[in-house]
């Protein structure tokens, strides 16, 4: 199911982006 895969990629990407933003603060 490609939608499930895209959802997982999106959640991982959001987590990485959040950790990067948290690191800048």
From Swiss-Prot:
Intracellular or extracellular location(s): Secreted
Positions of disulphide bridges: none
Protein keywords: Antibiotic, Antimicrobial, Cytolysis, Hemolysis, Secreted, Toxin
A Gene Ontology molecular function term of the record: toxin activity
Coiled-coil stretches noted in the UniProt entry, renumbered to this chain: none
Biological processes per GO annotation: defense response to bacterium; killing of cells of another organism
Taxonomic superkingdom: Eukaryota
Binding partners and assembly: Exists as aggregates of 3-4 molecules.
Function per UniProt: Thanks to its abundant amphiphilic alpha-helices, it may integrate into membrane phospholipids, leading to lysis of the membrane. Has hemolytic activity. Has antibacterial activity with a broad spectrum against various species of bacteria including both Gram-positive and Gram-negative groups. Also has ichthyotoxic activity.
Family: Belongs to the grammistin family. Group 3 subfamily.
Protein's UniProt name: Grammistin Pp 3
Organism: Pogonoperca punctata
